[in-house]
Amino acid sequence: MSKRKTKSPEADVEDLFAIWDHDGELLCEHIIQGIDNFSSKQCIGTGGFGTLYKTEMPIGRVVAVKKLHSSEDGDMADLKAFKSEIHTLTHIRHRNIIEFYGFSSFVENSFLVYEFMEKGSLRNILSNDEEAEKLDWMVRLNVVKGVAKALSYMHHDCSPPIIHRDISSNNVLLDSEYEAHVSDFSTTRFLKSDSSNWTSMAGTFG
């Protein structure tokens, strides 16, 4: 079990990292038990690279856990996507980018741990008439601004610049205040400053 080295103003996050440093294997077991060994009852979503679960940590903090899909022989189906997400999220930090807490790279249970977004994905909200009504034009404008700020940070403030390559309503998550957070960095690319860069489309179409 590994963690992202970062400073957080929230004491509970610091406590989480302290537990991770002290006994990562024990914390890994707690996460697996917390989601009932990746039971479908704890599932809150699924994507091309993994299945998302919700669980509560020993300190009482609720987190989201993305378990990577496995191939028929039990190995991780897309190791490249797994490494890409870890590499990207350990190099960036922004209020409009999902916060990354850590990961497990055991063969049978490879997963990533993130902050939990109470409102879920923008796509799910827009697909629900009742929830969509809560998104007035000011809220929607703030969502767009949040995504734009995250992309501007990745493109202009990171060195080398980072290209997400799969911005969609499914990868924009909203917290309890409807603040936008960009997620899913499995297809990102770091641009080389000393050469021409050509980046193909990846991920969601539409």
Task: Specify the residue positions occupied by each region the protein language model found.
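Conserved eukaryotic protein kinase-like
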Residues: 1-206
